[in-house]
């Protein structure tokens, strides 16, 4: 019997990432939530069509809502359903988690920023974080630190030889 090649198997269940989140914000505390989706949205996500780059999460009436995420409908989606790719999507969270988020957002001035959208078993989950915006000098310092880390690795690699 032949061995299974683990390199060919794709274990990455990520649908979409918000790569700008860590660049534009200080990410403090991370959370995971489910999404309330319609059928055509699930089909679109299975095809890998999603964009959460310009999205954010807001709290209204004790519920969390995802705004600005784009799930473009497939051309073969049902024609009798009106597809709105930019609609508000409800996040499925426990009351305790919602109360925690409300307290931090209203009292401490945090924003809630989506980080990634992924499959967990058969469910679509969204990972998000409490975040504070970065100033321009903070962004420059992060770039400088990242470049120094790369240079340090290069120097260590060449010094070992």
UniProtKB/Swiss-Prot annotation:
SUPFAM superfamilies in the cross-refs: Small protein B (SmpB)
One Pfam family named in its UniProt record: SmpB
Gene3D superfamilies: 2.40.280.10
Any Gene Ontology CC annotation: cytosol
GO molecular function: RNA binding
Source species, domain of life: Bacteria
Keywords carried by this UniProt record: Cytoplasm, RNA-binding
CDD domains per record: SmpB
Subcellular location field: Cytoplasm
GO BP: trans-translation
InterPro entries linked: SmpB (IPR023620), SsrA-bd_prot (IPR000037), SsrA-bd_prot_CS (IPR020081)
Family the UniProt entry places it in: Belongs to the SmpB family.
Function statement: Required for rescue of stalled ribosomes mediated by trans-translation. Binds to transfer-messenger RNA (tmRNA), required for stable association of tmRNA with ribosomes. tmRNA and SmpB together mimic tRNA shape, replacing the anticodon stem-loop with SmpB. tmRNA is encoded by the ssrA gene; the 2 termini fold to resemble tRNA(Ala) and it encodes a 'tag peptide', a short internal open reading frame. During trans-translation Ala-aminoacylated tmRNA acts like a tRNA, entering the A-site of stalled ribosomes, displacing the stalled mRNA.
Full protein name: SsrA-binding protein
Gene name of the record: smpB
